[in-house]
């Protein structure tokens, strides 16, 4: 292929030389016949056009393949650069999509942790309240029992003192005022009244609680 191109190129160069030689021969012939004054301007213009066309043709032939190769090389380079940029764009888009997915997943995970912490806090709060309630009930019950025990002790002591005082008074006055039967009846009546009063006091205290 290169050999054929070289043959064609040399053929066009030879043709150009022949055209110029023919032009010179024509000019010499015109000078010999005495018509150089009329042929000279026409010859110059024709040769100028022919030389220009030959130059353009030679430049086109000489620069065709290099220019074609240059344009093809630039086209390939631009295509590769566009392909690289497209690949980078797709990679960047994929990275952005992955980042969005990770952010969404992290946000969901954070919400789950937050809800878990809130639920655990609620359970802990309820457990603390329940324990405090049980402890307060236990303390109240213990205090009530201590108060009730002390009240029983105080009531028993008061009753004993009251009985002793009453017996002392009765033992001093009854012999002087009433007989033995009346003394026994008065003592029984006193103890009956005391028991009734104690029963009423206990019932009233139970109702008030």
Curated annotation (Swiss-Prot):
GO MF annotation list: proton-transporting ATP synthase activity, rotational mechanism; proton-transporting ATPase activity, rotational mechanism
Subcellular compartments: Cell inner membrane
Alphabetized UniProt keyword annotations: ATP synthesis, Cell inner membrane, Cell membrane, CF(0), Hydrogen ion transport, Ion transport, Membrane, Transmembrane, Transmembrane helix, Transport
GO cellular component: plasma membrane; proton-transporting ATP synthase complex
Source organism, top-level taxon: Bacteria
Lipid bilayer topology: Single-pass membrane protein
Bilayer-crossing regions: 9-29
Pfam families for the chain: ATP-synt_B
Coiled coil: none
UniProt family annotation: Belongs to the ATPase B chain family.
Purpose: F(1)F(0) ATP synthase produces ATP from ADP in the presence of a proton or sodium gradient. F-type ATPases consist of two structural domains, F(1) containing the extramembraneous catalytic core and F(0) containing the membrane proton channel, linked together by a central stalk and a peripheral stalk. During catalysis, ATP synthesis in the catalytic domain of F(1) is coupled via a rotary mechanism of the central stalk subunits to proton translocation.
Subunit structure, as described in the record: F-type ATPases have 2 components, F(1) - the catalytic core - and F(0) - the membrane proton channel. F(1) has five subunits: alpha(3), beta(3), gamma(1), delta(1), epsilon(1). F(0) has three main subunits: a(1), b(2) and c(10-14). The alpha and beta chains form an alternating ring which encloses part of the gamma chain. F(1) is attached to F(0) by a central stalk formed by the gamma and epsilon chains, while a peripheral stalk is formed by the delta and b chains.
Protein name (database record): ATP synthase subunit b 2
């Amino acid at each position: 292929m290169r050999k054929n191109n070289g043959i064609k190129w040399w053929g066009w160069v030879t043709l150009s030389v022949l055209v110029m030689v023919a032009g010179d021969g024509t000019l010499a012939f015109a000078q010999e016949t005495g018509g150089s004054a009329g042929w000279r301007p026409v010859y110059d213009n024709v040769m100028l056009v022919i030389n220009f066309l030959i130059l353009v043709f030679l430049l086109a032939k000489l620069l065709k393949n290099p220019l074609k190769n240059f344009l093809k090389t630039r086209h390939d380079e631009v295509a590769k650069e566009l392909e690289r940029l497209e690949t980078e764009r797709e990679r960047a888009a994929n990275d952005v999509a992955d980042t969005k997915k990770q952010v969404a997943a992290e946000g969901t995970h954070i919400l789950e942790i937050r809800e878990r912490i809130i639920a655990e806090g609620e359970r802990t709060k309820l457990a603390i309240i329940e324990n405090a309630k049980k402890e307060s009930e236990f303390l109240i019950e213990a205090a009530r029992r201590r108060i009730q025990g002390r009240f029983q002790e105080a009531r028993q002591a008061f009753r004993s003192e009251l009985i002793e005082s009453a017996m002392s008074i009765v033992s001093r006055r009854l012999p002087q005022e009433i007989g033995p039967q009346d003394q026994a009846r008065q003592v029984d009546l006193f103890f009956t009244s005391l028991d009734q009063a104690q029963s009423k006091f206990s019932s009233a205290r139970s109702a008030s609680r």
